[in-house]
Amino acid sequence: MLGSKKYISDIIKDEYKEWKNTKVIVSSGTGTGKTQFMLKILLPYYLQAGKRVLYLCNRKALYDQIRKEMLSLIGVTLMTYQSLQKELRKGSTNTYDLVIADECHYFYLDAKFNGYTDLAYEYVMGQQANVVVFVSATADSFFEDLVKDGVVKKDYIYSIPKSYDYVEKVYTYHKSRLTDIIDEILADTDFEKILVFVNSMERLIEMHNYYGDSAYYMCSQSQACSFATRDCIENKKFLNKRMLFTTKVMDNGVDLIDDDLRHIITELFDIDSILQSIGRKRPIDYLDTCSFYFKVYDGRAVNNFYVSNQKQLELVERYMANKDKFLQNLDVQNLDARQIARKNKIFYTDFRTGILKVNQCTLKKYQMDRNTIEDMKQNGYETVLFRRLGTELLNKKSELRIETESKDIFLSILKELERKKLFKEEQKELKEKFRDILGLHDRTMGINTLNGKLQDRQYPYKIVSCKDRLRQSETYNKRYWMIQKI
């Protein structure tokens, strides 16, 4: 159990003193002392020898956590990968004796939404005459590539298999059952807390529309979200409220040490992100247990992810097959490199020359995702998911029994608005409900589009357009919508 588990310092022992001009992998699950080894053993050893140290983090939350823990360490340069990329774009080329690449899955995992991961990647990979330590609990694919490409030798791999001995049960569910699951938990107990990872801002908004102020909500600071509370975690607990909904912004750097946190639900699609999300809880003792809930995507949803992934890859593969022909076609279409880079996440433009370039980290991530999604298309999402999660969690899988049926938010809205006259302002509000709750993002949201969505969702309602014929009315001769029962 928890009291007898190994820590990474037990595996490395004093071997770190023999690391010379090499690259090292430290791979182990959360709670195995990776960070403590770096801060309490490795960094002091280098600092006492007068060496220069760079510590890289992938999230601001992790940066803040590390900064608090290394207050007594003078001489360490602490940066996020994103800050390093900004410095490199300015031409900065500082050198260090030791580089800690913490949460190094960043190079692949963030590559889909950060166009400059290549800069940090090339900088770290290009380090010479020093030691680079790659640290992560979930960078399996990245570590495999490091070994396959000869970057890291097998003698410099230190790992501890991930343990989920604190997990009591594992469940799977489909999207429509999320609120049912949560409502069932809330009804069964009056203290157990729930952490939910949603896959989009639209889903976060939908949950806020349903649960309102009874829950906390977290998202990236770059998102304009009036109801998000980014300081809702105090002393590694979320206080006062029993629910926290978050996007993948909380995938690491935030540890939750709270024996009331008994349920972690994830709707994320990317399995590497899922592994990060379920690692947020740090059990206190063997009595501190938790259940996991994984959303299962059907074949149609998996195919949608595949189409989206392929759309990005195909353009880049045409470019790589014949660069000259590709660039000539750009000229013919009167397009420049920056326009292409804005449309395609794998391309970026060199900040000095403006030349079109391929982000190799992003390309690798898209290629890996293609292989994974093709596997899902053939064998099913759930099969591939549990293959990655491992047999320990698979063996804890149980059937989900739900007695509480949650209300349908949108159906309640339709019932409330039934037979009411909806003029221009009310129509605008209704369209916002279609967007926020049903995820409708068509450019033109006319009455036919809205009725099509109602039909797709099998709601027994339709919207009709009418004209006010009451001469005494202030809205005489104006058109309005009305929601009618079919």
Residue ranges and their predicted role:
Residues 139-185:
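Interdomain hinge/linker at the junction between the two RecA-like core domains of SF2 helicases
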Residues 41-42, 309-486:
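The feature captures the C-terminal accessory region of ATP-dependent helicases
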Residues 55-97, 227-234:
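Inter-Walker segment of RecA-like/P-loop motor cores
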Residues 267-292:
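Conserved SF2 helicase motif VI
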Residues 27-32, 105-106, 120-147:
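Conserved helicase ATPase motor motifs in RecA-like P-loop NTPase domains
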Residues 92-127:
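SF2 helicase catalytic motif II
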Residues 30, 35, 53-63, 184-211:
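Conserved strand-helix element at the start of the C-terminal RecA-like helicase core
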Residues 216-247:
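Conserved helicase ATPase core of P-loop NTP-dependent helicases/translocases
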